[in-house]
């Protein structure tokens, strides 16, 4: 009788152990891979500043980010503070370091070799044109931070006018003869003249900027020298409007304009 009790106890212990194994999380240690997404520094004329659009992940209609590990791509969701989680996550298993590629937008899990920006960026098209990437970053278990960088150039317009009644609210700014625009070669800027443009060099003698005033007068600016727009760079455009037309001066900015429009 005592021997039978010992046998029953042993069988019960094995059964409970097997149930525990079935319910254990995937991976050797069961740890789910989560990330915190930040941004890489931007180097412009010796300056070291944070490269951000709005300094966090707020305001996104589409919050799906692509994460690639060992050739497998999974969708992760990013919150306003950059925390990345997934309903079908990766697991650490027995690894202490992972090599990660990532990009935004998710684009059905396929990274565009060259980004394509929206033609009308006066509304949501501006944010929809902000392509981000992480390229082959080694991430240790102890610090799951990944650093995104912008793939485009940000154009920021600084308007001044000697004409009465001319302001950002009543002029239309367009950037012309651009590559990799979703429809055509023209980008309509935001209400404050900002735009995201695929990195490229535009040659001297090219019509680059069109400004339409409230009275429907339209002025076009032709580049006097080659204009190089690099990845992750913010380029300032000082636009002066007068009775005689427009004058444009370019300058490098030390950081991206983080305002909402």
Where are the regions a protein language model picked out?
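Sec-type signal peptide cleavage vicinity
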Residues: 2-6, 18-261
């Amino acid at each position: 009788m005592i021997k039978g009790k010992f046998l029953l106890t042993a069988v019960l212990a094995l059964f409970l152990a097997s149930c525990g194994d079935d319910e254990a999380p995937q991976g050797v240690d069961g740890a789910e891979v989560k990330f915190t997404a930040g941004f890489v520094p931007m180097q412009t004329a010796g300056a070291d500043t944070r490269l951000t659009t709005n300094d966090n992940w707020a305001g996104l209609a589409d919050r799906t980010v692509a994460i690639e590990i060992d050739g497998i791509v999974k969708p992760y969701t990013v919150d306003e503070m950059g925390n990345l989680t997934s309903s079908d996550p990766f697991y650490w298993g027995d690894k202490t370091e992972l090599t990660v590629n990532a990009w935004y937008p998710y684009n059905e899990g396929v990274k565009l070799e060259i980004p394509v920006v929206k033609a009308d960026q006066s509304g949501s098209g501006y944010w929809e044109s902000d392509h981000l990437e992480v390229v082959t970053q080694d991430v240790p278990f102890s610090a799951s931070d990944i650093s995104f960088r912008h793939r485009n150039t940000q154009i920021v317009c600084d308007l001044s006018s000697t004409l009465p009644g001319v302001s950002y609210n009543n002029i239309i700014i367009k950037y012309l003869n651009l590559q990799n625009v979703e429809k055509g070669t023209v980008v309509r800027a935001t209400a404050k003249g900002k735009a995201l443009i695929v990195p490229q060099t535009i040659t001297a003698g090219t019509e680059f900027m069109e400004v339409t005033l409230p009275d429907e007068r339209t002025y076009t600016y032709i580049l006097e020298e080659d204009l190089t727009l690099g990845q992750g760079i913010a380029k300032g455009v000082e636009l002066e409007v007068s009775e005689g037309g427009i004058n444009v001066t370019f300058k490098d900015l030390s950081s991206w304009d983080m305002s909402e429009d």
